[in-house]
Structure formats: C-alpha cells, structure tokens
Amino acid sequence: LIVFSLFFIGLIFLLIEFLIKQKKIELRKRLLSMSYFDAVLIGLAQSLAIVPGVSRAGIVMIAMLIMGFRREESAIYSFLLALPTIIAASFLDLYKERALLAQANLVYLSIGFFVAFLTAIIAVRWFVNFLKNHTLAVFGWYRIILALFLLIALRLAII
C-alpha cells in the first residue's frame, strides 16, 4: 500500500503541475480569501493522510492547488495546519514521560526544543522560497522513483 500511495500521489503531483502549466488551473487564490467551505475541503483532504504513504503536507498542498491557491501559500498553510497536532502530540509525550521529565535536565530539554524549532523554521522558509521559483514536480518524480526503488527492493527481497 505504501508503494502504491507513493507512486499514485507522485503522479497526482505531476498531473497537477501539468494542468497548471496548461492553464487549466490558475493559482490566484490567497489565504485571506479562504472560505469555510475551502477549509472543510482542505480538512477532508488532510484526512487522506491516514493512508500509509500519503503525505499530510503533500495532500493538503495538492488540494489547495486544485482549488487555485498559490504554491507558497499552500505550503505555509499546510505547515501551519500541522502545528496543533505537533503541539498536542508533544504535550501528550511530555505527560506520558512526566516521571522522566522530573529527573531530566531542563536546560538540555530546552536546548533541544529550541534547536528543533529553529531548524523547522529554517526548513519551512527554505521550502516556501523554493516554491516561489519551482514547481512541486520534483516531489512527484521523487515519490515515483522512491516507489519504483521500493518495489524493486521488495521483489528482490532486499527489504
């Protein structure tokens, strides 16, 4: 299922970029113009990430591109959409490990949190800047090549 999802979503990335290039989809919508209906559709698309091999960020960006949102704004919204889940999961982990947390050196924990947060900001900024001058086709090809590599590896019983 993972190999199929990687391949299929890769094809969708390529198809969407082809339709954009052919002017069948125009990327004019801005985040500030998002309607409640748009938000519901994006949320429904995000739920497809429950399927193994389907990227939550990727499926949200695909949905937003189909709806006509600009690439970089789709990426920003996709990453912002992940924040509540990441924060909730982090607090749940901290709660589950509260006994260890009491013994932990909070300085090291704080440094780790800060470095991870800073790295995430740098990565998101780089990705948004990348999308200002590039398409998502490279990610479509990446997913297709990875799916083919995994399929070959599975057939040869390497993995």
Language model segments and positions:
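Multi-pass membrane proteins that catalyze or facilitate reactions on polyprenyl-/lipid-phosphate substrates
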Residues: 1-159
